[in-house]
Amino acid sequence: MKIDKTLVVKFGTSTLTQGSAKLNLPHMMDIVRQLAQLHQAGFRLVIVTSGAIAAGRHYLNHPQLPPTIASKQLLAAVGQSQLIQTWEKLFAIYDIHIGQILLTRADIEDRERFLNARDTLRALLDNQIIPVINENDAVATSEIKVGDNDNLSALVAILVQAEQLYLLTDQQGLFDRDPRKHPDAKLIADVDKITDHIRAIAGGSGTSLGTGGMSTKISAADVATRSGIETIIAPGNRPNVIVDLAYGQAIGTKFSVQADRLESRKQWLYAAPSAGIITIDAGAENAMLMQHKSLLPAGIVNVEGRFSRGEVVKIRTQQGKDVALGMPRYNSDALHLIQGKHSQDIEQVLGYEYGAVAVHRDDMIVL
């Protein structure tokens, strides 16, 4: 039986370089072997990868550049293509396709871009293609940067509704003291709640090659666990670490979820103001409530209010009962045009399409 579970795995620069000044191909080959094993077992995988700047520096033979943002962006621009080619060639050994996505904070904070990014990720995963994600360092300014791939990976985990997020690093996990200064430091195996004490012992930044230290990993774990995603900080150089984590072995530091994924989503939908009303027929009501199906345009009989794609709306029966809250894939103007029509007619009517459904079941809470 295949496993239906979504994992986001973040690889830091130190993990991919193994402490050197370039990508460590033998180590990356072993990483891909593990990911291929999980992919073939049915896990839905998303990679968040660092390493573009290190790859660019090596490709350009370690040029002497001033320590400016422009220099880093130059290295990222050159190195990103080298980095993605490396992932692509290694996955090709196992006949697995990957898809590159470069994100900035603006892509996540803007509703339309957020939905587009989410839909792209879903499409890749639904077609057994592994998304490989990095921040778009070559063009991002400080105002639109997420800032580090730890926090980016947490946001990506929310985008794809992952069950788990793995932050792989050059450390064994979170220790009660800095193990580089205190040889007797003890590994903290489980963190039930991220407190000020946990943040304090996380300390500052990590290696010089990357931008993320233990403190950014704690920040990422906080974001993810509040959204119902279990997060684990684990050593990227441990043999078979990804496979072992996926099958439940205790490695590194595990951060327990702070809220159930569905409950977290329910609270958000309940709290959001309703921007409009979609009235549905009896067939759509039965499909949604009894069969847990998405809402199709064919089942819509009326659309009230003006709303954008992704705003929260009430879904109401013809008897006037509110039965669900949802985030439609189309704005109110588009829904007016396609209501009552078959899904295959959407593109012909609108000139574009965001999928066959009006409101996806994953974006809907039944009341």
From Swiss-Prot:
EC identifiers of the protein: 2.7.2.11
Binding-site residues for substrate, renumbered to this chain: 50, 137, 149
Subcellular location: Cytoplasm
Occurrences of domain PUA (ranges): 275-353
Gene Ontology molecular-function annotations: ATP binding; glutamate 5-kinase activity; RNA binding
A Pfam family recorded for this sequence: PUA
Gene Ontology terms: biological process: L-proline biosynthetic process
Annotated binding of ATP, by residue: 10, 169-170, 211-217
Pathway: Amino-acid biosynthesis; L-proline biosynthesis; L-glutamate 5-semialdehyde from L-glutamate: step 1/2
A Gene Ontology cellular-component term: cytosol
SUPFAM superfamilies xrefs: Carbamate kinase-like (SSF53633), PUA domain-like (SSF88697)
Family classification: Belongs to the glutamate 5-kinase family.
PANTHER family assigned to the protein according to its UniProt record, in alphabetical order: GLUTAMATE 5-KINASE (PTHR43654), ISOPENTENYL PHOSPHATE KINASE (PTHR43654:SF1)
Protein name (Swiss-Prot/TrEMBL): Glutamate 5-kinase
Organism whose genome encodes this protein: Pasteurella multocida (strain Pm70)
